[in-house]
Amino acid sequence: MIFHYYFYTDWDVQELLKNAIALSDKNFSELNNFYFSRYPNNIFLTVFFSKIFTLFNGLLGQDFAYVFLLVIQSILNILSGVLILKVTLLLTKSEKYAFFSYWLYLLILWISPWVVIPYSDSMGLIFPILMYYIYTHPKMHYILKSVLLSAIGIIGYSVKPQIAIMIIAIIMVSLLTQKIEMKPLTATIIAIFVVSFPMFFAINRINSTAGFDLDYEWEMTYHHFIKMGLNSETDGGYLANDVGSSISIENKEERVIYNKQIIAQRIKDYGVTGLINHQAKKTLNNYNDGTFGWGLEGSFFEKIFPNDSYVAKITRSFYYSSGKLHLIFQGIVQSIWLSILFLVLGNVLIGREKMTREFLVLMTSLIGIFLFESIFESRSRYLYTFVPIYIVAATVGFQQMTQNFKKRALKLKTGVKNEQK
């Protein structure tokens, strides 16, 4: 279906693709060193894209390579749905609830057009749910789990930094809830180090030898994104003036000092009440969009390819902002997303006896992504990679709501019978 409505977009995606093609063609003079000096976290994905372009350069051309990237993302999307099903079955021990979670996946992720945007959101979709699946796997040896989680966590972080929230949640819960035994702990640490160091070295090597001439004085540090997250003009969203003010300071140390001063000033100007109100608006921005910011980035529909087929007309009407059916698409995903968020609340009903490590990791990861969005720049798109985790949490919450309702109904029925006697 993606072949009928895919298009070229602008913003960061275009920057990655242009530079991936330049790397593939070894046209190093065309590389945007300034962009990647500012955002070095995008280098790994750009290098990966370049390898795909290199693979198809002499065969079917760049257009086919682009479509192949979308096929990869489609496969990752489908695999994410399978993992949602498996994890939910393990947690709820119910096929009924497992299939319920899969229906949620179909209605918000499988249907999602983000699969045609080759970027870290769709490429990173599988990582949190894959790590959680490995962690919850009942028969996998703990050393193998540690090795796989380390490897996948490092790759995931290189694709999209907030993916690391899942591995942080796993580490935190493990340290706080598990009894520490020196022998298995030592074996685990050794296994992690044996995997992690070579992988870190390999990824750094890939990034540093790709062909970019980076000036790390231009790097946008986390202080910039905290500053932007505190702006009142866009309620913590992207603000061109904030980007411009950071770029205007060439010295990295001076830029960090400047951003810290702006952070302190904005917090002072808000005050306690103002900061709470700002956070409320920011949370609404983050969580009140079931499309996850579809169509809002840059010149989104930059180049649309002619296609007069019936399927193309329907899908484009459904997914393109100007389409007659676009409001239906928005209505479907918005209602499903708000339902997911509501069902997540059912987890507060879970008793202590059901608070397993798996459950605690699930909740901790959601708290982690909430804090990430609360502290840094606000975008609903940044939630996309964690939607599979939200679906799992929503299904577990729905099961708990149902069980509590049945218990109360039974008590009420029993009480009425006793009164009649």
Model-derived regions, located:
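Transmembrane-helix motifs of polytopic, lipid-linked glycan transferases
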Residues: 71-92, 130, 342-346
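Membrane-interface alpha helices of multi-pass inner-membrane proteins
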Residues: 145-160, 171, 195
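Membrane-proximal stem/loop segments at transmembrane-domain junctions that anchor or position
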Residues: 208-309
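Extracytoplasmic catalytic/substrate-binding loops of multi-pass membrane glycan-assembly enzymes
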Residues: 5-21, 25-60, 255-256, 272
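Short acidic/glycine- and proline-prone juxtamembrane loop motifs at membrane-interface regions
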Residues: 113-123
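Loop-to-helix entry region of an early transmembrane alpha helix in multi-pass inner-membrane enzymes
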Residues: 39, 43, 58-79, 327-335
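Transmembrane-helix signature of polytopic, membrane-embedded enzymes
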Residues: 84-107, 357-360
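Membrane-interface anchor segments at the N-terminal boundary of transmembrane helices
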Residues: 66-68, 285-366
